[in-house]
From Swiss-Prot:
Organism: Toxoplasma gondii
GO molecular function, one term: protein serine kinase activity
Domain of life of the source: Eukaryota
Database matches in InterPro entries: CK1_Ser-Thr_kinase, Kinase-like_dom_sf, Prot_kinase_dom, Protein_kinase_ATP_BS, Ser/Thr_kinase_AS
Family membership noted in the UniProt record: Belongs to the protein kinase superfamily. CK1 Ser/Thr protein kinase family. Casein kinase I subfamily.
Name of this chain's protein: Casein kinase I
Lineage: Eukaryota, Sar, Alveolata, Apicomplexa, Conoidasida
Catalytic activity: L-seryl-[protein] + ATP = O-phospho-L-seryl-[protein] + ADP + H(+); L-threonyl-[protein] + ATP = O-phospho-L-threonyl-[protein] + ADP + H(+)
Gene3D superfamilies in alphabetical order: Transferase(Phosphotransferase) domain 1
PANTHER family the UniProt entry points to: CASEIN KINASE-RELATED (PTHR11909)
C-alpha cells in the first residue's frame, strides 16, 4: 500500500536513522522530484522535529541550507519533508579510505566556515559540529557542502537586542564528545567559539585519519567522556597537528583564545586557510578526493542501466565560495 504524507509526497525506503527518528527517501507525486522524509514518533520523550523545522525555515535561503517542503502530523508521526541530499562527509571520508588530501580539507574548511558563520548570523549556534552533519548536494549541487541536523541548536543571543546569553557552568555535554570543545567538556555553556573549535577537530580528523582520543576503553558513558576530556586537554595542539601545516595550529589556538561572548573573526580564519591553499599551488576547481571515485561508480551504474548521461564537472555557481 502506498503511504503518502502531506498530501503529495510518497514515502519510499528507509535511508537512515538517528537518535530522534528515521529518514526515508520520498517523491513529490506531482513533479517526481525526490525528497527526504524525516519521521518522529508523536510519543517521543524529547520531540525535536517541530523545533528543527522552524530552524530550517529561519535559515531558509542560505547557501548550503536544505529547504523544508512540508511539516505536519501524519498518524502517529511528526513529519518533515526536506531536500534530499548526497552522502555525508563521514561517508565520503570512509569512501576515501579514511584520509583526505590537504586540498580537499582546505576546500571543505572554506565552505564549512561559511555555513557556521551563516548559522551564527541568524543568532543560533549548532552545538553538534561533526562530519555526519555536513552533506554534499546532488546533481548540479554536488560541490556544495550543506549543514544539517539542528535538533541541538540553541539561540545564543536575542535577535532584537543582540543581548548574548549569560555565561554558565555545570552544563551536561551536548553534542558529540569526539569533536566537543574543551570548554564543553568542562560544563561551560556553549557559544560561537565552541562550534569553531569543534570544526578544528573535524579538520584534523580528516587530515590525520583519526584523533588521539578515539577508541579509549571505558565502562560508562561518563567515564568515556572523562577519558576523552583528559586526553584532549593533555594533547598539545602542536602534537595534534604535527606533520601538518602550522595554519591548523593557528586555527585551534585562535578558537581556544576566544572569550565566551566574542564574535569570531570568520574572515581571518577563511583567509588563513585560503592563503595556505594558494601557497600550495592548488586550483579552486571543486574537484574533491571523492569526485572521481563517485564518477567511476556512476559510470559503472550508467553502463549497467545502459543509460548515457554526459559527464559534466559541476562547479558551484555561488561566488561567495570562490577565492577572493
Amino acid at each position: 500500500m502506498e503511504v503518502r504524507v502531506g498530501g503529495k509526497y510518497r514515502l519510499g525506503r528507509k535511508i537512515g536513522s538517528g537518535s530522534f527518528g528515521d529518514i526515508y527517501i520520498g517523491a513529490n507525486i506531482l513533479t517526481g522530484d525526490e525528497v527526504a522524509i524525516k519521521l518522529e514518533s508523536i510519543k517521543s520523550k524529547h520531540p525535536q522535529l517541530l523545533y528543527e523545522s522552524k530552524l530550517y525555515k529561519l535559515l531558509a535561503g542560505g547557501i548550503g541550507i536544505p529547504m523544508v517542503h512540508w511539516y505536519g502530523i501524519e498518524g502517529d508521526y511528526n513529519v518533515m519533508v526536506i531536500d534530499l541530499l548526497g552522502p555525508s562527509l563521514e561517508d565520503l571520508f570512509s569512501i576515501c579510505n579514511r584520509k583526505l588530501s590537504l586540498k580537499t580539507v582546505l576546500m571543505l574548511a572554506d565552505q564549512m566556515l561559511n555555513r557556521i558563520e551563516f548559522v551564527h548570523s541568524k543568532n543560533f549556534i549548532h552545538r553538534d559540529i561533526k562530519p555526519d552533519n555536513f552533506l554534499i548536494g546532488r546533481g548540479k549541487k554536488m560541490s556544495v557542502v550543506y549543514i544539517i541536523d539542528f535538533g541541538l541548536a540553541k539561540k545564543y543571543r536575542d535577535p532584537k537586542t543582540q543581548q548574548h546569553i549569560p555565561y554558565r557552568e555545570g552544563k551536561n555535554l551536548t553534542g558529540t564528545a569526539r569533536y566537543a570543545s574543551i570548554n564543553t567538556h568542562l560544563g561551560i555553556e556553549q557559544s560561537r567559539r565552541d562550534d569553531l573549535e569543534a570544526l578544528g577537530y573535524v579538520l584534523m580528523y580528516f587530515n590525520r585519519g583519526s584523533l588521539p582520543w578515539q577508541g579509549l576503553k571505558a565502562t560508562t558513558k561518563k567515564d568515556k567522556y572523562d577519558k576523552i576530556m583528559e586526553k584532549k586537554m593533555s594533547t598539545p595542539i602542536e602534537i595534534l597537528c604535527k606533520h601538518f601545516p602550522f595554519e591548523f595550529i593557528t586555527y585551534l589556538n585562535y578558537c581556544r583564545s576566544l572569550r565566551f561572548e566574542d564574535r569570531p573573526d570568520y574572515a581571518y580564519l577563511r583567509r588563513l586557510f585560503k592563503d595556505l591553499f594558494f601557497r600550495e599551488g592548488y586550483q579552486y576547481d571543486f574537484i574533491f578526493d571523492w569526485t572521481f571515485i563517485n564518477t567511476e561508480k556512476d559510470r559503472a551504474s550508467r553502463r549497467s542501466q545502459q543509460v548515457y548521461v554526459e559527464d559534466n564537472r559541476q562547479v558551484e555557481e555561488n561566488q561567495n565560495e570562490l577565492p577572493m
